[in-house]
Amino acid sequence: MPASREDSVYLAKLAEQAERYEEMVENMKAVASSGQELSVEERNLLSVAYKNVIGARRASWRIVSSIEQKEEAKGNESQVALIRDYRAKIEAELSKICEDILSVLSDHLITSAQTGESKVFYYKMKGDYHRYLAEFAIAEKRKEAADLSLEAYKAASDVAVTELPPTHPIRLGLALNFSVFYYEILNSPDRACHLAKQAFDDAVADLETLSEDSYKDSTLIMQLLRDNLTLWTDLSEAPAATEEQQQSSQAPAAQPTEGKADQE
């Protein structure tokens, strides 16, 4: 007998506490596939679940890719062949996770979304997971993933500018991740900086709309936007921190920051 919606949500919370994120995904996927709009809590649980399972593998992929480059530079062909096979295994896992959540978004969540907030949230998620595919895909597959990511981010932006205030954490999180997409995937630093600066300036000009409930998340994302702008405009000398890691003097190379953009 399938678990009730209430039980699935409880089990997802339990799995989160136990750091068993694959099981958290399965429980929240069952809730998301019910055809009913998710509550804010359920939406965030779904996002956290997938972010953890994808985040661990994105970090693994970056580490393995870095090792591959070092071994290639040394001319260690036998090790490089082993590393490439291992990287391909990680990429297969990344693809499966991305395709899984993208299917849930397209088949259930986007179609059942009633509020502007939830529409922005889900279109942003769609943009994020196509972007994650574009991070490691090559040739035509990379172009396809990038095009679909751009399309989803634009759809999210169209709703966000009409239905959410500039200080709303979901609108700010969208701007943060969309700007990272322009910088990393489309190699367009000018567009990335323009988008990030516009979002930051609009939020600063509209601070009176900032609710007490979202103050912490909104100001954090505003800081991340400013951090990325500083890094991107500083002659690109200093790469930014990734979503998974803090900036560190020991970190040799990192990525522009993505924020807690999936949280309320």
UniProtKB/Swiss-Prot annotation:
Region (Disordered): 236-264
Organism superkingdom: Eukaryota
Pfam family, one: 14-3-3
Record GO biological process: cellular response to heat; cellular response to neutral pH; chlamydospore formation; filamentous growth; filamentous growth of a population of unicellular organisms; filamentous growth of a population of unicellular organisms in response to biotic stimulus; filamentous growth of a population of unicellular organisms in response to heat; filamentous growth of a population of unicellular organisms in response to neutral pH
GO cellular component term, pick one: yeast-form cell wall
Record-linked Gene3D superfamilies: 14-3-3 domain
Compositionally biased tracts (Low complexity): 236-258
Family: Belongs to the 14-3-3 family.
PANTHER family listed in its UniProt record: 14-3-3 PROTEIN (PTHR18860)
UniProt-recorded name of the protein: 14-3-3 protein homolog
Species, as recorded: Candida albicans (strain SC5314 / ATCC MYA-2876)
Gene that encodes it: BMH1
